[in-house]
């Protein structure tokens, strides 16, 4: 029998993305030496992030250095939009971290901790599916491969030449730094900066999305439970007070879910708006770069990255769709229940719930775009059209 998931299981991956950067949202007690170690690593990653982000931005501003090379423009554009997405996510996360912490504590209080209640809530149904976890593992694996590939390739080329060939000093990112990275010590420093910067933007990008999926799935779980409870009730005029008390508890819990969903939109609204814009730009840049580069190692790497980024946004969109579906299912469950067997008072009160549940709960990008599978389809359609136009242009 499959193990029933605890609340800690739900937030484990999201929390781990930031803990591996040295940032602990929950401030878990630890020895002073370990605290200094992880805090120092977080400072290193943050400094590397802002330093290299400034270099990327400077390179984009210095347009003359990219002019005449579509490949360079798209590669720098790809790097810039991925960097921009991570910066916006990080800033949004840090600004709203206390509110996210409060939201997490509230959801933990509501989470069913007894095994019997966990079965009623069907907690495992709302945990990250096996396919979703595989998407996340593949995404992270692709990022690790792209981070280590330049160093491994440089070493292999040097070793094949038996030390006679020049060391190529390949780096993760093509960004020019303020020091010479083609000397041994400079290369080591540049690679440390590249690696910590790469880990920072990947973990922040993935970690914030995981947090959004975690809290939205918790709300979806409670909505699903309310719908099941509503469908199981058998009201009658003889048990009017008991039935109305039960219905009142469902209405109150639904109102609580509405408030929590507003908190989710407050914390992740700007993040999702930036995520949607930068993801579309990323996919278009990767599509173009793959066409230009053709079938080589770098082209394959960017094809893998394209699939990973698209899959990541699909997973986010599917959680938004799940919340929409389960929130509307509550009104459907109320309508399909045996409400007509209840008292007149019960019938009036269930109308309140039906009216309240008519409007679906949605994860929206600042109220502009609703995150759903339809949004994912629109995004992929735009990317494909861009890809088709670029391919025809290149072939000419």
Curated annotation (Swiss-Prot):
Mode of membrane association: Multi-pass membrane protein
Segments on the Cytoplasmic face: 1-6, 56-70, 163-209, 288-296
Transmembrane segments: 7-27, 35-55, 71-91, 142-162, 210-230, 267-287, 297-317
Organism: Drosophila melanogaster
GO CC annotations on file: cation channel complex; dendrite membrane; membrane; plasma membrane
Gene Ontology MF, one: ionotropic olfactory receptor activity
Function: Odorant receptor which mediates acceptance or avoidance behavior, depending on its substrates. The odorant receptor repertoire encodes a large collection of odor stimuli that vary widely in identity, intensity, and duration. May form a complex with Orco to form odorant-sensing units, providing sensitive and prolonged odorant signaling and calcium permeability. Involved in the behavioral responses to butanol and 2-heptanone.
One Pfam family it belongs to: 7tm_6
InterPro entries: 7tm6_olfct_rcpt (IPR004117)
Main location: membrane
Gene for this chain: Or49a
Biological process (GO), any one: signal transduction
Other observations noted: The atypical heteromeric and topological design of the odorant receptors appears to be an insect-specific solution for odor recognition, making the OR/Orco complex an attractive target for the development of highly selective insect repellents to disrupt olfactory-mediated host-seeking behaviors of insect disease vectors. Odor-evoked OR currents are independent of known G-protein-coupled second messenger pathways.
Subunit: Interacts with Orco. Complexes exist early in the endomembrane system in olfactory sensory neurons (OSNs), coupling these complexes to the conserved ciliary trafficking pathway.
All ranges on the Extracellular side of the membrane: 28-34, 92-141, 231-266, 318-396
Protein name: Odorant receptor 49a
Keywords: Cell membrane, Membrane, Olfaction, Receptor, Sensory transduction, Transducer, Transmembrane, Transmembrane helix
Homology family: Belongs to the insect chemoreceptor superfamily. Heteromeric odorant receptor channel (TC 1.A.69) family. Or49a subfamily.
Localization terms from the record: Cell membrane
């Amino acid at each position: 029998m499959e193990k029933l998931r605890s609340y800690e299981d739900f937030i484990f991956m999201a929390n781990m993305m930031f803990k591996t950067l040295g940032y602990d949202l929950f401030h878990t007690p630890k020895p002073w030496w370990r605290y200094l170690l992880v805090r120092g690593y977080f400072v290193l990653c943050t400094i590397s992030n802002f330093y290299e982000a400034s270099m990327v931005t400077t390179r984009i501003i210095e347009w003359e250095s990219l002019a005449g090379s579509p490949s360079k423009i798209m590669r720098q554009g790809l790097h810039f939009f991925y960097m921009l997405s991570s910066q916006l996510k990080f800033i949004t996360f840090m600004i709203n971290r206390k509110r996210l912490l409060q939201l997490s504590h509230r959801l933990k209080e509501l989470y069913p901790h007894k095994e019997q209640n966990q079965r009623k809530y069907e907690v495992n149904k709302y945990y990250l599916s096996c396919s979703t976890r595989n998407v996340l593992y593949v995404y992270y694996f692709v990022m690790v491969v792209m981070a280590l590939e330049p160093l491994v390739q440089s070493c292999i080329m040097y070793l094949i030449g038996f030390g006679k060939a020049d060391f190529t000093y390949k780096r993760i990112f093509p960004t020019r730094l303020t020091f010479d990275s083609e000397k041994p010590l400079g290369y080591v420093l540049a690679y440390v900066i590249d690696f910590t910067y790469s880990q920072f933007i990947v973990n922040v990008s993935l970690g914030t999305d995981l947090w959004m999926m975690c809290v939205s799935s918790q709300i979806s779980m409670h909505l699903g439970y309310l719908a099941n409870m509503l469908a199981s009730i058998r009201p009658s005029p003889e048990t009017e007070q008991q039935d109305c008390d039960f219905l009142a508890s469902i209405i109150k819990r639904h109102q609580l879910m509405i408030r929590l969903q507003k908190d989710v939109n407050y914390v992740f609204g700007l993040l999702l708006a930036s995520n949607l814009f930068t993801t579309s730009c990323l996919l278009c840049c990767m599509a173009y770069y793959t066409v230009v580069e053709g079938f080589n190692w770098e082209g394959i790497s960017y094809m893998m990255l394209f699939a990973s980024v698209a899959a990541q946004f699909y997973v986010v969109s599917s959680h938004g769709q799940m919340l929409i579906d389960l929130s509307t299912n509550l009104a459907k469950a109320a309508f399909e229940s045996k409400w007509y067997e209840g008292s007149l008072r019960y019938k009036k009160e269930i109308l309140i719930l039906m009216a309240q549940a008519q409007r679906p709960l949605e994860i929206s990008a600042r109220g502009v775009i609703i995150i759903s599978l339809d949004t994912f389809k629109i995004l992929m359609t735009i990317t494909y059209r861009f890809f088709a136009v670029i391919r025809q242009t290149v072939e000419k």
